[in-house]
Swiss-Prot record:
SUPFAM superfamilies with a match to the protein in the record: Ribosomal proteins L15p and L18e
Source organism phylogeny: Eukaryota, Metazoa, Ecdysozoa, Arthropoda, Hexapoda
Gene3D superfamilies assigned to the protein according to its UniProt record, in alphabetical order: 3.100.10.10
Entry superkingdom: Eukaryota
Molecular function (Gene Ontology), one example: RNA binding
Keyword Ribosomal protein carried by entry: yes
Localisation: Cytoplasm
This protein's name: Large ribosomal subunit protein eL18
Organism: Drosophila pseudoobscura pseudoobscura (Fruit fly)
GO annotation (BP), single: translation
Length: 189
């Protein structure tokens, strides 16, 4: 009599347990936050550690404009804004508020504007000393669906109420600009 073999098809849990990158500085941060997460047992450190593992697509950039908006809405002027990703400048933002920011990477112009406004820019190892439990911090992240590839996802282009961008071979006169767009060529929708 033979036993039924167990199906091991779904045994593997697919999630990152370390960053794909071989960047030594990132890996040092992972070591640090692994220690903090184990010793403090705080949700903040668990989230930071998880985000340090993420791919670049899942760590989208955040502009100063959005940071300023969320910072103002939170109404906690003493809190440190934490972004596991890149912070970019936004020329449309005229007045940068005085804030303390901690991010993996800050563009040069964004850094200059924050410092000029009387704020400061921290690294994650400095944040670990200042706030090891995540107390008095504001954790933010950019929009993951803002990239161009995401604009093609969703209902098929052309069906009612679809705002999906079509995959067009070329942007010329003949490509998706004639039939259905003007009455002289077939019909006009």
């Amino acid at each position: 009599m033979s036993g039924i073999d167990i199906n091991h098809k779904y045994d593997r849990k697919v999630r990152r347990t370390e960053p794909k990158s071989q960047d030594v500085y990132l890996r040092l941060l992972v070591k640090l936050y692994r220690f903090l997460q184990r010793r403090t047992n705080k949700k903040f450190n668990r989230i930071i550690l998880k985000r340090l593992f993420m791919s670049k697509i899942n760590r989208p950039p955040l502009s100063l404009q959005r940071i300023a908006r969320f910072f103002k809405a939170a109404n906690q002027p003493e809190s440190t804004v934490v972004v596991v990703g890149t912070v970019t400048d936004d020329a449309r933002l005229l007045v940068v508020p005085k804030l303390t920011l901690c991010a993996l990477h800050v563009t040069q112009t964004a850094r200059e504007r924050i410092l000029k406004a009387g704020g400061e820019v921290l690294t994650f190892d400095q944040l670990a000393l200042k706030s090891p439990t995540g107390k008095n911090t504001l954790l933010l992240q950019g929009k993951r669906t803002a990239r161009t590839a995401c604009k093609h996802f969703g209902k098929a282009p052309g069906v009612p109420h679809s705002h999906t961008r079509p995959y067009v071979r070329s942007k010329g006169r003949k490509f998706e600009r004639a039939r259905g767009r003007r009455s002289s060529c077939g019909y006009k929708k």
